[in-house]
From Swiss-Prot:
Gene name for this UniProt entry: nuoC
Gene3D superfamilies, per the entry: NADH:ubiquinone oxidoreductase, 30kDa subunit
Name of the molecule in the record: NADH-quinone oxidoreductase subunit C
Compartments reported by the entry: Cell inner membrane
Lineage, top ranks: Bacteria, Pseudomonadati, Pseudomonadota, Alphaproteobacteria, Rhodobacterales
InterPro entries: NADH_DH_suC, NADH_quin_OxRdtase_su_C/D-like, NADH_UbQ_OxRdtase_30kDa_su, NADH_UbQ_OxRdtase_CS
Family under the similarity heading: Belongs to the complex I 30 kDa subunit family.
First-level EC class: translocase
Subunit structure: NDH-1 is composed of 14 different subunits. Subunits NuoB, C, D, E, F, and G constitute the peripheral sector of the complex.
Presence of keyword Cell inner membrane: yes
Amino acid sequence: MSDALKELAEYLSEKRSDDVVSTDVNAMGELSVTVAPAQMVGFIEFLKTDRTCRFSTLIDITAVDYPSRDRRFDVVYHFLSMYQNHRVRVRAAIREEDTLPSISGVHPGAGWYEREIYDMFGILFTGHADLRRLLTDYGFRGHPLRKDFPTTGYTEVRYDEELKRVVYEPVSLVQEYRQFDFMSPWEGAQYVLPGDEKADDKAGETA
């Protein structure tokens, strides 16, 4: 299988040399192709229609946040060719201010994934017919899967019985938020476990 994927990687690099930045087949036998963001639609259309590829099934689209990188986000697409029995991972690395072209014209179902990525990461897809939040409320502040999003969020939502509507309020913690130093030994409560008294008795006899 890995030999077949290596041949496919060479084929894609040759046929779409302007699109492909790099290819890799890892130890698990998975093919990854990094594509120039602006060329994403043309490359994915080629994957779908080329007779050697025939990656007609979009499995999913997701994103990964790498805050320390200049190109902060990886947008990752997974495709399946039921004709060739192959899978391929396609990725594009983009900056925070960059946009990606929507592939919903090639794979109509991609629209839902792109909305989710916009909602969770704030990545914009140009040419999307309805790029709205999907999982959070329309007035939600921030994008929850970014690494710089606070674990408490910015606001909390509750239903107000007096106002008879949902209200947004600043986050109010019932206890102080604790930062743990996981590089240091934990200094917590001292618990007495069954059998500890025997160790104490033995230590007393030795003394």
